């Protein structure tokens, strides 16, 4: 099973994110064989030594890459089973989270003040940032429950079609421009 992390915040916030990633991955590794972590994007390489070292004893296969082309991002995301998003509350303004949804991934993420539709229509399992155990439990559930993971993936694919795909975006522009006339 493969978990994707697309982008890590820099500085102290990034350190906190990596501690949360490691904590959730260790919990999942106790229940899932051959667990893989693929981290890539902004600041990922800065935290590679920490992620590799902290997950070594948990037998997690860790690979970290830097900034990738759009095609490479799509390949990484489409090769994953779930996206873990711990960069604060998920919202439609979070491009990396939208990329995971657009690739049909289940997403485990924190909810926040800006979390709402269309994110809540996608295959996102929302947890409280204040409750660390919720993140662990959510990741384990998505990785171990094949039917649940498939349901979340289906919801992400539908959200991509309804809200985030170019035809849906174009339709929204047409409606907005028509209402101005």
Region roles according to the model:
Residues 2-51:
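Conserved catalytic-core segment of nucleotide-activated headgroup transferases in glycan assembly
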Residues 39-41, 49-74:
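Nucleotide-activated donor-binding/catalytic signature segment of Leloir-type glycosyltransferases, i.e.
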Residues 69-80, 102, 137:
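Short acidic alpha-helix that forms the nucleotide-activated donor recognition element
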Residues 77-92, 105:
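Acidic donor-binding loop of glycosyltransferase active sites
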Residues 102, 111-126:
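Short acidic/histidine- and often glycine-rich active-site loop of Leloir-type glycosyltransferases
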Residues 121-133, 141-146:
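Conserved acidic donor-binding segment of nucleotide-sugar-dependent glycosyltransferases
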Residues 141, 148-162, 175:
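A short, well-ordered alpha-helix in the C-terminal region of glycosyltransferases
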Residues 166-181:
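C-terminal alpha-helical cap of glycosyltransferases
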């Amino acid at each position: 099973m493969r978990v994707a992390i697309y982008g890590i915040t820099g500085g102290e916030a990034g350190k906190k994110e990596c501690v949360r990633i490691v904590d959730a991955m260790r919990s999942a590794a106790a229940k899932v064989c051959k667990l893989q972590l693929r981290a890539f994007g902004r600041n990922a390489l800065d935290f590679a030594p920490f992620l590799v070292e902290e997950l070594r004893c948990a037998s997690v296969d860790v690979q970290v890459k830097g900034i990738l082309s759009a095609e490479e991002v799509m390949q990484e995301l489409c090769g994953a089973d779930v996206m873990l998003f711990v960069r604060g509350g998920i919202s439609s303004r979070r491009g990396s989270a939208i990329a995971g949804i657009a690739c049909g991934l289940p997403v485990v993420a924190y909810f926040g003040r800006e979390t709402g539709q269309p994110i809540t229509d996608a295959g996102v399992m929302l947890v409280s940032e204040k409750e660390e155990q919720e993140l662990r439990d959510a990741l384990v559930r998505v990785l171990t429950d094949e039917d649940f993971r498939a349901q979340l993936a289906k919801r992400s694919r539908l959200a991509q079609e309804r809200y985030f795909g170019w035809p849906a975006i174009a339709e929204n522009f047409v409606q907005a421009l028509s209402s101005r006339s």
